[in-house]
Amino acid sequence: MMKAILATLAIFGCIWPGQSVMFHLTPNTQKCLKEDIQANQMVMGEYEVSDVPGQVIDFIVRDTKGHILSQKEHITKAKFSFMSEVYDSYEICFISKVPPHQRGIAQQVALTTKKGVETKNYEGIGEASKLKPLEVDLKRLEDLSDSIVRDFVMMRKREEEMRDTNEKTNSRVLFFSIFSMCCLLGLATWQVLYLRRYFKAKKLIE
């Protein structure tokens, strides 16, 4: 039983690992990494940038409305954390700044992020609550299961919202198409009647 539980935990750990990325930031440019995060979810991370004399990199985290959740200038190596208040797309940005008189070179940036269950210290929780190792693993599994359920519920909700939006868009397109056809038919009828009156006035037709 214990082996089965630990195997399940290992599978979940492979599906939801901490995200690590490494890239080179071109001088006087900005690179942002975006991710959709659920409401009331803790996000923790750590970054490190290569040191280049005379060049600096600023760090900022913000949501789609421009609210700043974390910010630091002239970064080298540090940790950060923030709590998402609402479901939104959050972006982590690194901004390179190089003086005009200096020829800049690309700097290496390493970033590691964790969110939700990944941010919890289960060893500390187990020690504080005097839990056995198996009970700690069960607690981790329970939290992972809850996280999976919330993710699927959110995905289902977004799918329904997108379907409703598509249905509304299709209805509007159909209405606009019918309206356009009616306008074209009306214009064609008006042109025929106008030309008929014109030709009659010129006595070209009876």
Curated annotation (Swiss-Prot):
Q: Name one Pfam family in it.
A: EMP24_GP25L
Q: Which stretches of this protein does UniProt put in the Lumenal compartment?
A: 21-172
Q: Which residues cross the membrane?
A: 173-193
Instruction: Specify the domain of life of the species encoding this protein.
Output: Eukaryota
Question: Any keyword Nucleus?
Answer: no
Single GO cellular component annotation? cytoplasm
Q: Which residues lie on this side of the membrane: Cytoplasmic?
A: 194-206
Q: Which residues form the signal peptide?
A: 1-20
Chief place where the protein resides: membrane
Disulphide bond pairs: none
Q: Which GO terms describe its molecular function?
A: cargo receptor activity
Membrane-topology annotation of the record:
Single-pass type I membrane protein
Q: Which InterPro entries match?
A: Emp24-like (IPR015720), GOLD_dom (IPR009038)
Q: Where is the GOLD domain?
A: 30-140
Q: Where does the record say this protein resides?
A: Membrane
The alphabetical list of record keywords is: Developmental protein, Membrane, Signal, Transmembrane, Transmembrane helix
List the SMART domains.
Answer: EMP24_GP25L (SM01190)
A single GO BP:
endoplasmic reticulum to Golgi vesicle-mediated transport
Stated family = Belongs to the EMP24/GP25L family.
What role does it play? Eca and bai are essential, though not redundant, for dorsoventral patterning of the embryo. Specifically required during early embryogenesis for the activity of maternal tkv, while the zygotic tkv is not affected.
Q: What is this protein called?
A: Transmembrane emp24 domain-containing protein bai
What organism, scientifically named, is this protein from? Drosophila willistoni (Fruit fly)
Q: Which gene encodes it?
A: bai
